[in-house]
C-alpha cells in the first residue's frame, strides 16, 4: 500500500501575506469551504494573535469546517499560543503551528537572541502548546540556512516536548532540489527521535523552484507533508503551488508511490475563487489552472490530440475541473440547469439563498450576453457580492458620455453604508471620470498602484474582470469587479477596494 502525502494549505495565512492579497473573514471562510471540498488535510486558517480580524477568521473557520484539520500559526510565546488555542476551540480537529527562527542571521539580527535562548524558547513553546492541543507543528524558521548541528538539537527537543509534525522551511527560496531533498534526509537520519513525528516541507519560490524543492523533499528526504497554496500565492515570488504538487504526485504515482486525498475536479474552482478574491490574475501558461494549460496551437499537436489524447496530454483537463463544453447556458436556462452547472464546475454555493442570489445575477448577465461561458459562471459565483458580509460601498448604476475631442463625463450612483449617493465628474477617459466621481464623495486619499483588465472569455462580448489595487497609510488592498461593460467593472472594483481599505485591521508580520 502506498504512503499518504498530507496536503497542508496555507493560502489563508502565508498566501495572504502577498501585498494586496488581504481578505476579510467572510472571504476566508468561502475559500476554506472550497479547500474542504478539495479534501485538503490541513487548512492553516490564519495567525490568530496577529489581529482581532485574524482571530475571528480562524475562529469562524474552526467552527464551520468539519472535515479538515484547522491550524493557526503562532510565534513561540505563551500569548500567541494561548490566542491560537482559544480561536481553535470549536474545531473538530485542531493544530497549533508554532515557530521560531534558527538561522544565525535571524537569531542575531531579528530576534537578538543567543542560540541557547532560542533552544529553550522552542522547547517551552512546544510544551505549552502540547498542553492545550494534541496536534502541534513546529517550524524552525529559515531552517535551510541554519547550522545543521544546532537545527538537529532544536528539532530533537521539539519532538521530545510533543511536536507531532516537524516542518522544515526554505523561508527565502534559496534551496536547490537535490540539495534540499538531501538536507531533509540528513535531518531525519541525524535526529534520534525523527520517527516520532511527521516531516513537512515549506518552500518559497524566489528562484522558481518551490514545487521542485517540495517534491525533492518528499522523494529524496522522505517528508510526508507539503505546505502549499492555491495558485502558488504568497509574498515575493510566492509559495509552492498546491495544484502542481498534487497533480505531479497523482500523474507520476509510478515515481512517487504516494496517495493524496485531494478531489482534483475542484481545483479549477478553487484557483478561480482565490484569484477573484485576491485580484491576483493567473498567468495563461500557468500549469494546471492557466487558460492555456490544455491548449494546443501547433497543427501537428492538434492532429495528434484529435487522434489520441495521450499523444500530447498527460492529464485530462476534466480531472482538474476544466470542461470541453464552452457555451454552457443562456437566458432561457432554468435554475436547476444553473445549479447543476455549478456542481459540474466544482463551484457549489453555501446555501439555497446563495444559489438564488447567484441565479438572479446570472439572469441579469444572460440578458446582456447571448452566450454564457464556464468562465462567466465562475466569475459570477466568485464575485464578492455573493455570499459575503455587507460592504460599506456598493455599485448601483452608472452613465457616461464621451465624444472625440471632448473630456468624458461620468455620473454614478452607489451606496455608502446603505445610503444612496450620486456623483459626477469628468476625466481623462471614461474610467478615470467614473473613479473620480466616486472619489469626489468618498475622499479616501488612497493611491491607485494597480489597474488591470482581464477578459474572462475569448469573445468580443466577454465580461471584463478589473482589478484595482489601492494603497493608503501602509495598507494595500485589492478590489475586483466583473461586467460586460469595462467602465462598470472598474467602478465595482474601485468600490470593492475602498470597502476593504476602510475595514482592514492592522496585523503583525508572520513567518515566511
Swiss-Prot record:
Per the record, the major location class is: cytoplasm
Protein name as it appears in the record: 2-isopropylmalate synthase
Enumerate the PROSITE patterns for this protein: AIPM_HOMOCIT_SYNTH_1, AIPM_HOMOCIT_SYNTH_2, PYR_CT
| Essential cofactor(s) | Mn(2+)
The subcellular localization recorded is: Cytoplasm
Concerning its family, UniProt says:
Belongs to the alpha-IPM synthase/homocitrate synthase family. LeuA type 1 subfamily.
Q: What does this protein do?
A: Catalyzes the condensation of the acetyl group of acetyl-CoA with 3-methyl-2-oxobutanoate (2-ketoisovalerate) to form 3-carboxy-3-hydroxy-4-methylpentanoate (2-isopropylmalate).
Record SMART domains? LeuA_dimer
Lineage, highest ranks first: Bacteria, Pseudomonadati, Pseudomonadota, Betaproteobacteria, Burkholderiales
Any one GO molecular-function label of the UniProt entry:
2-isopropylmalate synthase activity
Residues where Mn(2+) binds: 14, 202, 204, 239
Q: Which UniProt keywords apply?
A: Amino-acid biosynthesis, Branched-chain amino acid biosynthesis, Cytoplasm, Leucine biosynthesis, Manganese, Metal-binding, Transferase
Q: Which example biological process does GO assign this protein?
A: L-leucine biosynthetic process
Q: Does the keyword Transcription apply?
A: no
**What's the catalysed reaction?**
3-methyl-2-oxobutanoate + acetyl-CoA + H2O = (2S)-2-isopropylmalate + CoA + H(+)
- Which HAMAP family is this protein grouped with? LeuA_type1
Species this protein is from: Albidiferax ferrireducens (strain ATCC BAA-621 / DSM 15236 / T118) (Rhodoferax ferrireducens)
